[in-house]
Regions:
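Short hydrophobic/aromatic beta-strand micro-patches
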Residues: 9, 50-52
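Long, low-complexity, Ser/Thr/Gly/Pro-rich intrinsically disordered segments that act as flexible linkers
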Residues: 92-97
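A broad, low-specificity signal marking well-ordered, structured residues that form hydrophobic/aromatic
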Residues: 4, 47, 89
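Short acidic/glycine-enriched loop/turn segments that link adjacent beta-strands
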Residues: 42-45
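Active-site-flanking beta-strand signature of metal-NTP-handling nucleotidyl enzymes
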Residues: 2-8
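Short, surface-exposed ligand-recognition loops at beta-strand->loop->(often short) alpha-helix junctions
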Residues: 9-19
């Protein structure tokens, strides 16, 4: 199993907006093990989307189909201005032992 963290460092005042958008997206994706988290300690204005997959291959397959359903496409429209809401981002992939 792997756990993936997609991390966004948001501009001040935007973390809750970004988290809300991702939460709405997480509610419509077929994968049900998606968590949207905001910082309580550490770097400020951080939003982390955490998800788990059986393998790296399963993650790659999931990325291929992301945003394909009509419901996802509708929610993804709200992301069109997201690039203006964050400063940087990164992805971390962890193997669970």
């Amino acid at each position: 199993m792997i756990i993936v963290h997609d991390i966004f460092i948001c501009k001040p005042g935007n973390a809750s907006k970004v988290a809300k958008m991702f939460k709405e997206w997480a509610d419509v994706v077929p994968q049900k093990n998606v968590y949207v988290m905001t910082d309580m300690t550490g770097q400020f204005h951080r939003v982390v989307i955490a998800s788990s997959f059986e393998s790296l291959t399963a993650y790659e397959e999931g990325m291929k189909t992301m945003g394909q359903s009509e419901e996802e496409k509708k929610v993804m429209e709200k992301f069109k201005d997201m690039n203006e809401m964050y400063l940087s981002g990164s992805r971390e992939i962890f193997k669970v032992w």
